[in-house]
Amino acid sequence: MHTAHRLLAAVALTGAAALGLTSCLSTEPFPGQQGSRVLNDAATALRGASTFTMSGKASSQGQVNLSVSETGECKGTIEARGGGTLDVVRTRNHTFLRGDETHILAKTKDMPEDQASQARKDMTGRWMRMEATAPSMKGLTNLCDRDGLLKEIYSIQGAEKGALTKIDGQEAVTINTPEGVFLVATKGEPFLLKVTTSGPNPIDLVFTGINKPVQVDVPADKDVYNLDDKG
């Protein structure tokens, strides 16, 4: 389960996509190609895309919805440990996080009331800035590292082609492996569309928005909350 563990650490959801067989599906996707070849080509195709969005559940990070560029920049939302949701903006040099009300309340609940009140005022609607390479950002860094996220797929053994299906209206072939189930587009580029693993740390990630522009805007300084300034 090495690959599944790597994916879990990197991320990147039951029912995140609508699946269903229809009578108009092709009868033989990727004729003459083994499941391992189809899966490897799917990983290569997605790695070659300029952008993509991954959404779903990654047990190491909870629910995620992140748009990732080829340069490692990303933006979106992640589930915050301890409660709530974090807005995310990651550039090459910095990571910016902005918590929602639930997250801020969870972070300040054990503070004395006067400190908690001031902290909530300071944090509400503002971004916390950190170095992109900060150890505390390792999980997010792995999620935004598209090559690191996908390259372990090449080492998966025992991949076999399965049934045809559809995901969000797009035809896909099921690739069954000992580590999980993968859905690969059968029309156009053979992009990887979904990854599902089970076990004690299950993940279920859908890949959409492939090659659609992602604009990562850095928050203005006035909207950034600097913890160092608060002692």
Where are these regions (language model features)?
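Secreted/processed peptides and extracellular or luminal domains of membrane proteins
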Residues: 30-31, 80, 150
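Short, exposed beta-strand/loop patches in secreted or surface proteins that constitute
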Residues: 44-45, 65-69, 87-88, 160-166, ...
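One face of beta-strands
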Residues: 48-78, 82-88, 93-97, 191-195, ...
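An acidic-aromatic
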Residues: 71-142, 203
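Gly/Pro-enriched, hydrophobic low-complexity segments
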Residues: 163-223
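Short, basic/low-complexity N-terminal boundary segments at the transition from targeting/disordered tails
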Residues: 70-73, 136-168
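Outer-membrane beta-barrel proteins
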Residues: 34, 38-39, 150-153, 157, ...
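N-terminal leader/targeting segments and the immediate start of mature chains
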Residues: 2-65, 223-231
